[in-house]
Amino acid sequence: IGYLPEDTQRQALIGAMSVEQNICMSQLLAPGLLCGCGRASFTHTASDYMERLRIDCQSPQQPVSQLSWGNQQKVNVAKWLQANCSILIMEEPFKGIAPAALLDLYNYVCQFVLGGASILLISSNYAELAGLCDAVLVMKEGHIAKRLPRGADATARSILEALS
C-alpha cells in the first residue's frame, strides 16, 4: 500500500536527497546496497520513471527540493509505482499542479489502474472525482453517507446534499 499525502514536500519526500534516491526509496536498504552494489540499477530505474512521467529535472542526482511542485509530486508518484504497490492512497494529489503536469499525472494514474492496481482518491475537486473514479463515496461523520457510481452526478450539489 502506498500513500501520497497532501503535503508532499513535508511528508513524502526528502528534499536533500536526489530525485533518484526519492524514487528508489523503498529499495535503499535492499541486500547488496550496503556494499555499494545496485547504484546503476537505481539510476536506470529513476531515469525510466523520469521519462515515463516526464519529470523535468537536470539529472537523477538533482536534489528533489530544486524541482517544481508538480515535478515533486511526479517523483512521489514514481516512488510508489516502482515499489509495485497494488493500492495507492492519494490525498489531494493534483492540488496546485500546473496543467501540463496535471495531464501527465492523470494519464499515469489511469494507466496504473488499468494495470490492475487500485487507487483511493481523496479530493475536494468534484470534477476530478467524477472524471477519475469508478465510484465516489461521500463520507459524513466517519460513515459512508452516499455512494455515487461512475456516470452518476458527482457534482458539488449532489455531494453537498449527501452531507446534509
Where are the regions that the model predicts?
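Glycine-rich phosphate-binding loops of nucleotide-dependent enzymes
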Residues: 1-164
